[in-house]
C-alpha cells in the first residue's frame, strides 16, 4: 500500500458485491480489503488499519450497525468514516442509519455513486482516482 493510498474495508455477505466493489474501488485508487461477515470484518479490524468502512446494514451473522459500533470501539475514526449500504427501506433501517450519523447508499446503486460517497469520507487525504480514472 502506498503511503497516500486510502484503505477501504468492504463488508457484505454477498461475494459478488464484495468482488465488484473491490474491483471498482481498486480502479479508483483505493487499497481494498473485504469481509463476508461481521465477524470477519471485526477480525480484520483487530489486525489492520482501515481509513473507511463500507458495510451492508443486513449481514446474517451480525447486523451492520452492531459491527459499526464494535469497529468504532477499535478504530474511533470509523464513527465518522463509515458508509452503509442497504436495500432495506424499512423505518427500522432508516432509524439505524440516522442514529449512526453516517452516510448511506441504497441498493441497487451506481458504482460511481458509491465511489463518490467513499471519496467524501476522506477529504483530508489523497482520494486516488475518480470513477472515470482521473486524478482527484
Task: List the predicted regions and their residue ranges.
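The feature encodes the CheY-like receiver
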Residues: 18, 60
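Conserved phosphotransfer cores of two-component systems
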Residues: 46-48, 71-80, 97
